[in-house]
Amino acid sequence: MSKIIILRGNSGCGKSTAAKALQKRIGNGTFLISQDYVRREMLGEKTGQHNQTVSLLKNLVMYGYQNCEVSILDGILSTGTYDDLFNLIAELYAGQTFAYYFDIPFEETLRRHNQKSYAHEVGEIQLRKWWREKDLLKNISEKMICKEMNTDDIVEMIYADITR
């Protein structure tokens, strides 16, 4: 039965790093869907434009459900904008959805962001503008990831959750 792992949270909190490490840990055939990559690289949409992104993410999630044992979806994935996507996930992956919210304080998120090679492209003012405090899903339960957890801790916790 197909499973989906959802990694959500504010920009710069470590979701994509954890998603890539988790894909490597789970192994061959693990389908990684990155909201940022789909929006910026595949579709060329700017921040605030999500018309095509939501539709393509829904198609990718369906592909993962039909063809992959495990799919990982990572991104900011704000409630409201992506509610249709989460409704689809709740329906398709009933009982096989593993969702995590990166509940990282802004100061820690900014510190992590500033360590990235592309940190100069997006500054503190923009990060604050994008910030959404505890933007939790309404129809899918999310396990919280706190700032004390490193990437290895996160990966091993999620791996244990999906292999029980």
What are these regions (language model features)?
Residues 7:
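Hydrophobic anchor at the beta1->P-loop junction of P-loop NTPases
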Residues 10:
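P-loop (Walker A) phosphate-binding loop of NTP-binding proteins
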Residues 13:
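ATP-binding Walker
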Residues 16:
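Walker A/P-loop
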Residues 20-62, 66:
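Conserved substrate/cofactor phosphate-moiety recognition/catalytic segment
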Residues 52-94:
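Glycine-rich phosphate-binding loop used to anchor ATP phosphates in small-molecule kinases
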Residues 93-112:
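Conserved phosphate-donor/acceptor-positioning beta-strand/loop module used by diverse small-molecule
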Residues 115-157:
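Small-molecule kinase domains that catalyze NTP-dependent phosphoryl transfer to phosphate-bearing small molecules
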